[in-house]
Amino acid sequence: MTRRLAAVTVLAIAACAPKPETTEQMAARMKAESDAARTAIEAVNARAHRYFAAGNVDSLAIGYAEDVVVMMSNAPAIRGRPAMRAKLAELMGYGTWEMTATTTRVDANGPLAVEQGSYVMDFKAGPRAPAGMATAFPDTGKYVTAWRKVNGDWLVFADILNTDRRVPAAATKGH
């Protein structure tokens, strides 16, 4: 009797187990998740651009996860929210920045999303800009940002961006 009851219990549990997701179901779920993530991420980005324009470093830094890693062109990786906040404050202190980012794609699966996009930026040096820094320069580039949803909020946990600007040609000796 005990064996029979155990066998019936195992069969009942197996019958109640969720069916594996089909490829089509997964694609539909991920499309819906990606669409929702894109809408949310674009809203976060719009807020971040307002904070950036206003020089509000503290509000801007909150959009980064505590363990964020940011990799910018020609610079060491920035690790952690406090380091990112310090870098933002440093950069904003150099002068006036104007930036527009355009999201071109978001792929999401559960609490993770990857955003691809491009940016256009303009900089005008202020009195606290380091010696030798260009007084003004426009820039265009692209980025890939990894997002993690934490307690309902999308936070950046990895960001890599790079410029489309060409590296200046080195002076040739004797020419």
Language model features with spans:
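Bacterial N-terminal signal peptides that target proteins for export
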Residues: 1-6
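Hydrophobic pocket/interface hotspot
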Residues: 48, 60-61, 68, 80, ...
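A mature extracytoplasmic/lumenal domain signature
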Residues: 64, 74, 110, 117-121, ...
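A short gly/proline-enriched turn/hairpin at secondary-structure junctions
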Residues: 63, 69-79, 90-94
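Surface-exposed, charged secondary-structure patches
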Residues: 85-133
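Short, low-complexity N-terminal intrinsically disordered segments enriched in polar/charged residues
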Residues: 16-66, 168-175
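Short beta-strand edge/turn micro-motifs at domain boundaries
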Residues: 17-21, 139-167
